[in-house]
Amino acid sequence: MLSFLLSAIIAFSPAPADTTVSAPSLFGMAKALLGYMSTQATSAEDSTAINILQQAVGALEAGDRDGAIAPFKEAAAQSLSGAASEAGLNVEPVLPAGTDSSLVSRVNPATFFLNIPAANYSGIAPLAINGLEGDFLLVDDKSATEGFRKVHLSFDDNGQIIAAQDIGFIATSTGATGIDGEGIVYDVRRGTVLLAREASNEILEFGLDGKATGRYLHTASYFPKNGNAGLESLSYNTENGRFWATTEGCPEGATQLRIQSYAPYFWPLGHWFYTLDKPAFKTKGAIYAYGVSEICAMPDGSLLVLEREANIPGTSVKEATGAVVKCKLYRVEPAKTKAGKTLEKHLVTRIDTRALDLSFANYEGMCLGPVLKDGSRVLILVSDSQAGYKGILRDWFKTIILK
C-alpha cells in the first residue's frame, strides 16, 4: 500500500517546469485504475486504495489537482506513521484541527467493505470482543422488516478495521415494518438485544434469535414523537448496566434536548439537558439533517455525543456534489452535573466529509471496540449510505483511538 501511495504522489505531483502533463490524461489514468481496482478488490487495503482513487478522480473532474493529491499525502502519512510505529520510532500521527490530543491519539482513515451489504446503518453495538477480533450488531433504519445484522470485524494494532465478514441478518419475531430502527445495544447481563424505534419512541428487548421478550425500556413521555426528531441514540454501559437514550432534535419550541438514563431493570433514572451547537449552514439544502446522531456510554461514566449536520443542496448530480456532512464529537460527564441541569460539553474531535472528494459519510452509529496493546480504546463509527445510493455512497467504517 505504501509503495502505491508514494508512486501516486509522484504521478500526481506538479511536473517540472519543462514538462507538460495534461489533467485529462491524469483523469483518464486515475479513472481507468479505479475501474480496474473496483472489480479486483478483495481486502480492506484494496478498499482503502479505492477510496483514495475515488477522491482523486472527483477532484480531477472538478479541475482541482491539489485536491487530487491531498488524499494520497494523507494516507501516505498514516502509512508512514504506522510503519514507524512498528519500527519502534515515536512518530505523532496528524490529528484533525480542533482535536483534543489529551483524549485522542489517532483518527484513522475511513474504509468500507464490499462484503458488507449496503444499507442505511444507523446503529452499531459490540456483541463479543476477543483481542483484536469481535462480533458486532448493526441496525438499519430502512430495513424492510425489523431486525439486526451480525458482522465480524478484525482490527490491526493501530485500531484500523482491516477485515469484515457478514454473518447474517436476524429478523425479529414482531415482523414490524416502517419502525425506523435507530439505536441498538447488547445487554451483557441478560444476553439480549434492545432496539430503539424512532417512529414510535419505543425501546424493545429481543433475544439474539430475534424473539421478542415482552420487556421494554420505559421511555419518557417528553421525548418528541414528530418523525425524525424522535429517539435516535441508544447506548449501554457494561460497567454499571445503565442504558442511555436521547433524541435527534429538540422538542417543538425547546432549545435543548434531553439525555435520559435508565436503570439495569429498565426504569428511567435521571435526565440531563444538552445544548446543540448552532447550525453551520445559513441556507438549508433540499435534504438537511441536524442534531445528535448517536451517543456512546464510556466505562468511566462519561458520554460521547456525536453531533451531525448534513446539508445536501439538491437531488441532481450537479447539486449533490455540494453535499457536506459536519460531525463533532463531544464528551459530557453526567456524574459531575446534577440531574435536570445542563451538561457542559468538551470537544473531542471533528470530522468533515464532502461529496466532491467522495469522502461523504453520514455517520449515524457509534460504539466501543477493542482495547489496544497500549491500553487505548477503539471507538467505531459507521455511516448510513442510503443503501449505497446510486452506487456512489459507501457504508464507511471509521475508528478513533481514545487514550
What are these regions (language model features)?
Residues 5-12:
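Hydrophobic alpha-helical targeting segments used for export or membrane insertion
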Residues 38-47, 61-69:
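Charged, low-complexity interaction regions
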Residues 21-46:
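Amphipathic, heptad-repeat alpha-helical segments
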Residues 58-64, 72-403:
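Sequence/structural signature of beta-propeller domains
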Residues 12-20:
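Signal peptide processing junction and immediate N-terminal pro/mature segment
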